[in-house]
Amino acid sequence: MKKDIHPEYRPVVFMDTTTGYQFLSGSTKRSNETVEFEGETYPLIRVEISSDSHPFYTGRQKFTQADGRVDRFNKKYGLK
């Protein structure tokens, strides 16, 4: 490998902003925020969706998609 061209791979804490769930993983992503996790200080990366809040992993289905073309067509012609 060439020197000084690869990003630094280090442990970071990812935090699900929806649920507050935190987990430690390796990443090259940079952050100015830090958090104490299991007695150590790590960079903090905030994510909107993780395995703790995603409907596929939680088993809870919720529809957040806005009306699409098919829905508008069905409403316009009273098909549903």
From Swiss-Prot:
Protein's GO biological process: translation
Domain of life assignment: Bacteria
One Pfam match: Ribosomal_L31
Membrane spanning stretches: none
Record's keyword terms, sorted: Ribonucleoprotein, Ribosomal protein
An annotated GO cellular component: ribonucleoprotein complex
Gene Ontology molecular function, alphabetical: structural constituent of ribosome
Keyword Transcription regulation: no
Binding partners and assembly: Part of the 50S ribosomal subunit.
NCBIfam families on file: L31 (TIGR00105), PRK01678.1 (NF002462)
Family: Belongs to the bacterial ribosomal protein bL31 family. Type B subfamily.
Record-given protein name: Large ribosomal subunit protein bL31B
Gene source species: Streptococcus pneumoniae serotype 4 (strain ATCC BAA-334 / TIGR4)
Highest classification ranks of the organism: Bacteria, Bacillati, Bacillota, Bacilli, Lactobacillales
